[in-house]
A protein has these predicted regions:
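Short glycine-rich anion-binding loops that position phosphate/pyrophosphate groups of nucleotides
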Residues: 1, 6-9, 25, 106-108, ...
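Active-site diphosphate/adenylate-binding microenvironment
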Residues: 67-146
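Short, well-ordered alpha-helical microsegments
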Residues: 9-12, 47, 88, 109-112, ...
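Generic structural signal for well-ordered, non-membrane alpha-helical segments
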Residues: 43, 59, 63, 80-88, ...
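A short acidic, often aromatic-flanked loop/helix-cap motif at beta-alpha or helix-coil junctions
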Residues: 27-29, 43-50, 109, 131-132, ...
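Glycine-rich, acidic loop regions that bind phosphate or pyrophosphate groups
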Residues: 1-67, 170-171, 184, 193, ...
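Redox-cofactor binding/interface segments in oxidoreductases and associated redox assembly factors
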Residues: 3-4, 21, 103, 153, ...
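Thiamine diphosphate
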Residues: 114-311
Length: 311
């Protein structure tokens, strides 16, 4: 694995046999505990050098297997409920050529990563320290630097409120289209695999009230009034039909004279259902069997077996 980063907030380890760190600082930073080589250079120089040595992998068995599996997964895509995942599924491929997509972290980033855009569309996500970090500020700055390109920003309601002051800048350009997927809470902290859910569950309180900020800014006119007050164009949708009606405007290649903000109202139940659907398109049967056994024997049974096995 080629590692070009510095500080990482990753809470998991990528299982690579070797890690090559490429960075002008030349420092030894063994993030993944598999560091093998350090290249004291810019990543552009590194990849330019190895790109000249490239081989033809078009007939690689591994690449062919990946393509076949991708094809199989796409053929099994279900109909998703109205959610960030559904929005991505009907929008990603329609983004205009040479446009730029900025994604809010966690839910938006994950949802849109499931679907391809055109090859000429560039994607970014300002993850920062993996909190709700300035994606709105980032896209505004980028759009100012490149007025000839169309910029999209897809983010959740909490990320929008966190960085909404950026829209008050008098120089916000008209080549930005912002999609605010408003599910009324911090969904990332709600679903069972999350830390927020685990913490709330362990102390017997509602994750909605104490972790997810459910019901925050519940006025249906808050974003609308703010956006109108700044002189931008505002659209609001709460069904698939309404979204599909305004989709041509969202993905239009024509220049507009005002920044466009689309508030998309979804609910957390649909977000959760869509995530479960897309995560179970292809299931490893061995993992299903293990989960069933664990559920059947319970935690005490698992601990007893571990004790018998000396683990």
């Amino acid at each position: 694995m080629v590692h070009i980063g510095d500080i990482s907030s990753s809470d998991y380890k990528i299982q690579a046999k070797e890690v090559w760190r490429v960075n002008p600082d030349g420092e030894i930073r063994d993030t993944f505990q598999k560091l093998y080589n350090v290249f004291e250079m810019k990543e552009v120089e590194f990849f330019e050098y190895y790109n000249k040595k490239k081989q033809d992998y078009s007939n690689s068995e591994l690449l062919i297997a990946y393509h076949q599996e991708e094809k199989e997964i796409l053929s099994r895509m279900p109909e998703f409920p109205f959610s960030n995942i559904w929005i991505a599924s009907v929008t990603a491929k329609k983004l205009p050529s040479n446009s730029v997509l900025h994604l809010g972290i966690r839910n938006s980033l994950r949802s849109w990563n499931y679907f391809d855009t055109q090859e000429t569309v560039t994607g970014y996500s300002n993850t920062g320290g993996f909190g709700i970090d300035g994606s709105l500020s980032t896209v505004i700055g980028a759009a100012l630097c490149h007025p000839d390109r169309l910029y999209y920003c897809v983010l959740g309601d909490l990320a929008f409120f966190y960085d909404m002051n950026a829209l008050g800048n008098r120089h916000v350009p008209s080549n930005i289209r912002i999609l605010v997927v408003n599910n009324g809470l911090g969904f990332e902290m709600k679903f069972p695999a999350s830390w927020g859910y685990s913490i709330a569950n362990s102390i017997g309180v509602s994750e909605d009230n104490y972790v997810c900020a459910a019901g925050h800014y519940s006025s249906p006119d808050l974003i609308k009034s703010y956006v109108y007050g700044l002189g931008f164009e505002y659209l609001k949708v709460s069904t698939k039909e309404q979204y599909l009606d305004c989709l041509p405007k969202i993905v239009s290649n024509e220049k507009q004279d005002r920044t466009l903000v689309v508030e998309i109202v979804v609910n957390s139940e649909n977000e959760d259902a869509a995530l479960n659907l897309i995560g179970s398109i292809m299931v490893d049967e061995s993992n299903v069997a293990k989960a069933a056994i664990k559920k059947a024997i319970g935690k005490k049974g698992i601990n007893a077996i571990k004790k018998m096995m000396g683990r």
